[in-house]
C-alpha cells in the first residue's frame, strides 16, 4: 500500500515542526499528536498509512502506544517507525518487539528517514 498520510506522535513541538516540514516537502500529508490520547484520536479520525512514534512522552510512552496500535485489529497494516533519542540496543530490540517496523534514533537523518518510509510503501 503506498504511503501518503503520516501521523507524527512526539511531545516536542520542535521535532513535530521539523518532521512535518520534511514530510510535507516530500509530498506526504501529515497529521500530528503530542501524546497518546491525541494519537488515538488522530488514528480514529484520519487513518494514516504510517506512524512515526517518539518514545519519551508524558502519560503512555511510545513503546506502550506502539504495542496498543500494532496489537489492535482495527489498525492492522499501519506500520510504526519509532523515532527516539533512546539509542541503547535493548531499547531498539524492545521497540521492535512491541511491533515497530523500524527504529530511527535522534537526531534524525532526513534522507535516511525518507528512504525508510519509501521502503515501506
Model-found features: residue ranges?
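The feature encodes the CheY-like receiver
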Residues: 58-59, 76, 88, 106-107
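Active-site beta3 strand of CheY-like receiver
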Residues: 46-52
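C-terminal output helix
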Residues: 108-118
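Charged docking surfaces used in two-component/phosphorelay signaling
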Residues: 17-25
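Short hydrophobic/Thr-rich beta-strand motif most characteristic of the beta2 strand and flanking loop
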Residues: 27-34, 42
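Short, glycine/charged-rich "phosphate-handling" switch motifs in NTP-dependent
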Residues: 101
